[in-house]
């Protein structure tokens, strides 16, 4: 059976929300180097949204990626963001603006952005899902999905009402796995129940799992020399239903590190899983994540 990930080369993606900056502008030279390194290492999945860097992320992708490489060299994901639409008639002009900003004539994936109970109600009321599915039928989108920020029961409702959804992007990392407010594990299990492949955002929890408390750092230092980010990203990528893990990289150094351990991906081994469990226990003990009871 054909999968929406058939043309995605590896399970690691370039999240373009924290690109390197020069003052208030994206550093195109540095970003181009990052794009080149990413593609040269065999990766091809890029993720953006109109709101990232106040619209500059899309423009940077046109300048650093889409104008420099053939269309078949990359997979590009964009999103329908609620900030920019109030009625159905707003959707197609906004979508066209995104295509032009990115310099492409179709998106490989297009996600309903940051869906929660309230935004889902807004999108339903304006028939946004139906419009995006029509764009898919017209060939302007290859695959249609959602990015999601709410409780698992809301996700279950959305996937029940719209079984046409092909992919779900969720916040997922080892600290949020059992967090009662994020419900990473429960959301992942809902996706599996509905047979939807998962894309992971925030695998390092906005950097929190890179800059660890001293006690937690000592635990990871006892492993075999991988970076803190490597253990967090590999944790997420080790789950069978997770097809893509995004990282919002902001430098060539971060890109080199991440490409190094994801190029020939290996799931966490037992020693590493036990170390991650100890780090989570330290976080809970310091009140940095809620106890699950």
Task: Write out the residue ranges for each language-model feature.
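Conserved, mostly hydrophobic/aromatic
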Residues: 14, 38, 46, 61, ...
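Structural motif corresponding to the early beta-alpha repeats
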Residues: 52, 68-88, 113
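Short beta->alpha linker loops
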Residues: 52, 56, 149-150, 250
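Short, electropositive alpha-helical surface patch
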Residues: 62-75, 129, 162-168, 259-265
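Short catalytic-loop micro-motif centered on adjacent basic/acidic residues
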Residues: 45-52, 142-146, 244-246
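Structured C-terminal cap/extension of enzyme domains
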Residues: 29, 36-39, 43-44, 63, ...
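N-terminal binding-site loop/beta-alpha segment at the start of enzyme catalytic domains
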Residues: 1-74, 105, 131, 137
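Glycine/proline-rich, positively charged
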Residues: 22-23, 29, 36, 85-204, ...
């Amino acid at each position: 059976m054909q999968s929406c990930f058939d043309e995605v080369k590896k399970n690691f993606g370039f999240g373009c929300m924290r690109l390197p900056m020069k003052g208030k502008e994206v550093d195109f030279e540095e970003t181009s180097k990052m794009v080149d390194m990413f593609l040269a290492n065999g990766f091809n999945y890029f993720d953006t949204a109109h709101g990232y860097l106040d619209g500059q992320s899309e423009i940077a992708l046109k300048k650093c990626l889409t104008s420099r490489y053939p269309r078949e060299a990359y997979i590009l994901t964009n999103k329908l963001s609620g900030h920019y639409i109030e009625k159905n008639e707003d959707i197609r002009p906004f979508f066209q603006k995104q295509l032009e900003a990115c310099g492409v004539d179709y998106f490989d994936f297009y996600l309903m952005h940051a869906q929660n109970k309230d935004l889902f109600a807004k999108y339903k009321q304006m028939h946004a899902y139906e419009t995006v599915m029509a764009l898919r039928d017209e060939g302007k989108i290859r695959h249609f999905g959602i990015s999601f920020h709410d409780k698992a029961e809301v996700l279950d409702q959305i996937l029940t009402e719209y079984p046409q959804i092909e992919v779900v992007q969720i916040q997922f990392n080892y600290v949020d796995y059992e967090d009662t407010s994020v419900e990473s594990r429960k959301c992942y299990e809902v996706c599996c129940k509905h047979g939807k492949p998962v894309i992971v955002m925030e695998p390092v929890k906005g950097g929190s799992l890179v800059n660890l408390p001293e006690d937690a750092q000592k635990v990871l230092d006892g492993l075999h020399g991988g970076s803190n980010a490597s253990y967090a990203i590999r944790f997420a990528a080790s789950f069978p239903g997770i097809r893509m893990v995004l990282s919002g990289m902001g430098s060539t150094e971060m890109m080199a590190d991440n490409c190094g351990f994801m190029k020939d991906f290996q799931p966490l081994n037992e020693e590493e899983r036990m170390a991650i469990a100890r780090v989570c226990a330290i976080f809970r003990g310091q009140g940095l994540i809620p106890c699950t009871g």
